[in-house]
Design a protein with these regions (language model features):
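Active-site segments that bind and position negatively charged phosphate/pyrophosphate groups
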Residues: 2-124
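C-terminal charged capping/lid subdomain of soluble metabolic enzymes
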Residues: 100-169
Length: 169
């Protein structure tokens, strides 16, 4: 692991977790919006991921949003928790990182083991998106119906994931 980068990313995520609901509920709140812009600038800085492999598949998969007139952030809000669940089911070695995310960013109660903490963290993220940000959490809520999933699979196949119907519908 790369503790400096990991800690910086965790702090950025925690800051976004704290400030984004304020920026959404109070769009005129300069401090919250400025903090979000500053956090976004840091998140895009390669310093945060220097030295370790990132999960760029999520951003590659998200490119479908331009086809369906969704913002980048909305598409990521919909697919990120499902993508995390997919990764956790595919590769249990991510459980520790996802558990840390749940505990330190989402503020979950310790469930006693990494796998349970990872699942609780993903659930907390999903609830945050739905309940605090008031965003849709499925593609079907965005009127992306089953007949469009074959087209969406081209994005999935480009990043070596499986049938999108199973994950996001």
């Amino acid at each position: 692991k790369y503790p400096l980068q990991f800690n910086v990313v965790e702090t950025l995520l925690r800051t976004v977790r704290q400030q984004l609901p304020i920026a959404v509920e109070e769009p005129e709140n300069y401090s919250a919006r400025a903090t979000m812009l500053w956090a976004a600038s840091w998140a895009l800085n390669s310093f945060c991921t220097s030295g370790y492999k990132t999960q760029a598949q999520l951003h590659a998969l998200e490119q479908f949003s331009s086809t369906y007139d969704m913002t980048h952030g909305l598409a990521l809000a919909i697919i990120t928790p499902k993508w995390m669940t997919y990764l956790l089911n595919k590769d249990e070695t991510v459980a520790g990182d996802f558990a840390r995310f749940g505990l330190n960013v989402m503020g979950i109660q310790d469930q006693g083991n990494d796998m349970a903490n990872a699942k609780a963290g993903i659930e907390a993220l999903q609830n945050f998106i739905k309940d605090e940000l008031h965003l849709p959490t499925t593609l079907s809520e965005m009127n992306i119906t089953d007949e469009k999933f074959d087209e969406l699979n081209k994005f999935v196949n480009a990043v070596d994931i499986y049938d999108i119907r199973q994950q996001y519908g």
